[in-house]
A protein has these predicted regions:
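A conserved ligand/cofactor-binding region detector
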Residues: 1-280
């Protein structure tokens, strides 16, 4: 990647080289396919750092670690460079991530669907014995995200938002991969965040995918939460219908092509949204 010997590379260069190589290895293994697919919709996925997990599931972790050590590098130090995706917070997100790991390892056709949060929940910092909340950015020019080249339009009262779909490959242990599919808006604007994690909650055109679980202690925050959840499920429903019809589904037999699991109540609007789309 950098036309240099490993010994002469910085840890950052080695990390980005490993990132690119690992993504190619996952893509080369192919994806779990089948007529019927599991769609796991969740507001959060606490997937953790991916490099070491992917190397383990590809069966090459020890080999890579040995090669780096022979060249004066430590894989543990390389792993520290990777930013953790700010896509989840607690047990609900960890449950979702574990289900994806299981689906991939068992070799089942399936994928997770959620939102591509730019700044996560928040990052906790301490200064002068006081806690401060700051944004937790993680998206870099080179990351596990891959633009899927898929977009949908989601209607809201008075305006419409165009989505962009990004994929993260989830490796099954010694098996093919599945995809975590994350919807985003191209016009999300991180610059609207002020002190701490404060931002204009009414600016829905620019804040919709900034934060996981934005403050909902007022009407603007509650509206943002609802709009976030509807954006997620409308995109999910459109994706599910597109994939099913591409396989030959006539919509009357949708149950033969799709199984939908919703993680808690956040994605529950996918039920009326599917009905709305099917009746159009």
């Amino acid at each position: 990647k950098y036309n240099k010997n490993v010994k002469d590379c910085t840890n950052e260069e080695i990390y980005h080289g490993l990132l690119s190589w690992t993504k190619e290895q996952l893509k080369g293994r192919g994806y779990q396919e089948g007529k019927k697919k599991i769609y796991y919709i969740s507001a959060e996925f606490l997937i953790g750092k991916l490099l070491s997990n992917n190397l383990i599931n590809l069966g090459v972790y020890d080999e890579v670690a040995k090669y780096l050590k022979e060249n004066g590098k430590e894989l543990s130090m390389i792993e520290e460079i990777e930013p953790e995706p700010s896509l989840g917070n607690g047990g609900l997100g960890r449950l979702a991530a574990c289900f994806l790991d299981s689906i991939a390892t068992l070799g089942l056709p399936g994928e997770g669907i959620g939102l591509n949060y730019h700044l996560g929940l928040f990052k906790q910092e301490f200064k002068d014995h006081l806690q401060f909340e700051t944004p937790n950015p993680w998206i870099q020019p080179e990351s596990w995200l891959t633009d899927a080249g898929v977009s949908y339009y989601v209607p809201f009262k008075g305006f419409m938002l165009k989505s962009t779909l990004y994929d993260i490959d989830v490796a099954g242990y010694e098996n093919k991969a599945i995809k975590l599919r994350l919807f985003d808006i191209d016009i999300a604007d991180e610059s609207i965040v002020g002190e701490g994690i404060s931002f204009d909650k009414k600016d829905l055109l620019h804040n919709l995918t900034l934060f996981l679980y934005p403050d909902d202690s007022d009407d603007a925050g509650r509206k943002l939460r609802i709009y976030q959840q509807y954006f997620m499920v409308s995109n999910a429903a459109q994706l599910i219908l597109d994939e099913a019809t591409a396989k030959g589904c006539n919509l009357h037999d949708l149950a033969d092509y799709a199984v939908i699991q919703i993680n808690d109540t956040h994605p529950s609007m996918v039920i009326p949204e599917l009905i709305r789309l099917l009746t159009e």
